[in-house]
Amino acid sequence: MLIKKILQFTAISFAAVSILVACSDGEAATTSNGEAVKKVKVAYDQSGKPMTYIDENGNPTGYDVEVMKLVDEILEDYEFEFVGTSNDDLLIGVEQGKYQVGVKNAFWTEERTAKFIFPQEFLGLSSAGLVVKKENAHIKNLSDFASAGFTLAPIAANNAQYTVIAEYNEANPDNQVKLQAGEEFSVDVVQWVNEGRVDGGVQIEGSFNGQVLTEGGPYHHLKDEIVYNEFAVIKTWPLFNKKEQEFADAYDKAIQQLKETDALNKLSEQFYGKDLFKVLDSVKR
């Protein structure tokens, strides 16, 4: 009799635990319609401030990251896990399927279309410019830079900034920028210019502001010696793994909803100090 009661108690306890686990799993893994939630890994370059970085509390943030958080809120069928990593690991990881999507202030290039899915809707806008010494502040664009015969900080061939300069050179064969492919993905442009190793370099405005104009930045002491001159505003994109077309399509629908509001404008102002969407009509790339 005692053994029978013990067996009955064990069976009841096991059933109760099973029900609790099932309920718990159901809440975490299904939508309000009872459909399964797809968990996806969103990689971000953790050193790409203000586009993608880790804040003082250890949380992922930046323009690209915050937009993807809004996308996550809209997409009930998906659950995002943000994974901070390096630029190289992001590119390799998304291509190989370690991550389903990656954000890193990425520009579109023909080469990248062979490795990643580019969605229909862009993620944001980024200001690209020339960093030069104050005495060369009259150099406003790539044409000025080329005409002056200035030397440019090297850019890795797989860096989309290299493609931007290469496209300019192709369109201007008689006034080309001296473009040198670097071994590293990017170099410390401000340092190279300040030391006189080159006459100028290409940098994203957000990065320049964080390094030079922001109090406490590593080169804030050079704020009166180094200048940034914007030469283009360029669309930026999330990079999806080649097998994630359905996910990319879902992203497109969510971003379309967000673009009908002022959410992206506000994030641009928050992280870049200005609403880059105001010049969207003049963006060529």
PLM regions with names:
Residues 28, 78-81, 158-180, 253-285:
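Ligand-binding clefts/hinges and TM-proximal coupling segments of bilobed small-molecule sensing domains
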